[in-house]
């Protein structure tokens, strides 16, 4: 009986360790994304006369524009 309890406890501890590691990794990735540009020296002077460069984006980045395939005007192989 005590052997089964120790197996259950070991399983629960390993599950807890795995979940805490996953949370730590996701938080680290989130912090890396949000602080990527704040430590940059280009972003340090907010009162510059020049407009902000692409290195210091404001807000969320735009999603990439969808690429549309160019259709051919050829009639070859299209039937009668």
From Swiss-Prot:
Signal sequence, start to end: 1-28
Entry keyword set: Apoplast, Cell membrane, Cleavage on pair of basic residues, Endoplasmic reticulum, Golgi apparatus, Membrane, Repeat, Secreted, Signal
Motif, SCOOP motif 1: chain positions: 32-46
Domain of life the protein comes from: Eukaryota
GO biological process: response to jasmonic acid; response to salicylic acid; response to salt stress
Cellular localisation: Cell membrane; Secreted, Extracellular space, Apoplast; Endoplasmic reticulum; Golgi apparatus
Keyword Nucleus belongs to the record: no
Motif SCOOP motif 2: chain residues: 66-80
Conditions for induction: Induced by salt stress and salicylic acid (SA), but repressed by jasmonate (MeJA), mainly in shoots.
Region (Disordered): 37-80
Annotated Polar residues bias: 71-80
Alphabetized GO MF terms: LRR domain binding; receptor serine/threonine kinase binding
GO cellular component, one term: endoplasmic reticulum
Function per UniProt: Brassicaceae-specific phytocytokine (plant endogenous peptide released into the apoplast) perceived by MIK2 in a BAK1/SERK3 and SERK4 coreceptors-dependent manner, that modulates various physiological and antimicrobial processes including growth prevention and reactive oxygen species (ROS) response regulation. Inhibits root growth.
Family indicated by similarity: Belongs to the serine rich endogenous peptide (SCOOP) phytocytokine family.
Oligomeric form and interacting partners: Interacts with MIK2 (via extracellular leucine-rich repeat domain); this interaction triggers the formation of complex between MIK2 and the BAK1/SERK3 and SERK4 coreceptors, and subsequent BAK1 activation by phosphorylation.
Name used for this protein in its record: Serine rich endogenous peptide 15
Upper taxonomic lineage: Eukaryota, Viridiplantae, Streptophyta, Embryophyta, Tracheophyta
